Regions:
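Sec-dependent N-terminal signal peptides
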Residues: 4-14
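A structural boundary/capping signal
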Residues: 18-172
């Protein structure tokens, strides 16, 4: 039995299955930390959220876990999935309609995640930058993000704040 479990774990790793776990924000409770609460109160727009992340966080891969918004706030190191969870939580707190997009690149073992905000049009952010609201579709955002990264995508999946599936796209 142990050999079977080990074999399954190895197969998942070798097939490039990312462990970009979807953090269930409905289970997240804002901690009783005045500085954290003040921080989220002051980050009122997606652009402010992204600027805060760029100024305060350092990119570090966490392929096996997704940090809560508070954990990222405390340790200040995370990957695109951690940044995405942080930004979605704070934007939703300020009543923005938010989505997250998981993108599978053709030549990558791991998926990439970005945050999408519904302003007049769609805007988005990754772990580095905020992109102005000028996009009409999720596909446009995926195409542009991949263009910037010089990557080809094979699949993308869009979820809403409550982890509901919104859209899937394939580029095979």
């Amino acid at each position: 039995m142990k050999k079977i479990v080990l074999l399954i774990v190895i197969l998942i790793f070798l097939t490039g299955c990312s462990s970009l776990a979807i953090f269930n924000l409905s289970d997240f409770t804002i901690p009783d930390d005045e500085l954290f609460i003040m921080t989220i109160d002051n980050l009122k727009t997606p652009e402010e959220i992204c600027r805060y992340m760029a100024d305060n966080f350092e990119y570090e891969e966490h392929p096996d876990i997704t940090l809560s918004p508070y954990q990222l706030y405390l340790i200040k190191k995370g990957d695109c999935n951690d940044y995405m969870t942080f930004s979605i939580f704070i934007a939703d707190y300020h009543e923005y309609e938010t989505y997250y997009v998981l993108i599978t690149f053709a030549n990558e073992r791991y998926k990439h995640s970005i945050t999408v905000y519904k302003e007049n049009k769609y805007s988005f952010s990754d772990y580095e930058m905020y992109f102005l609201p000028k996009y009409d579709t999720f596909l446009e955002i995926v195409e542009y993000d991949c263009f910037l990264r010089r990557e080809k995508w094979t699949e993308y999946i869009v979820y809403d704040y409550d982890n509901g599936l919104i859209e899937k796209g394939s580029n095979n």
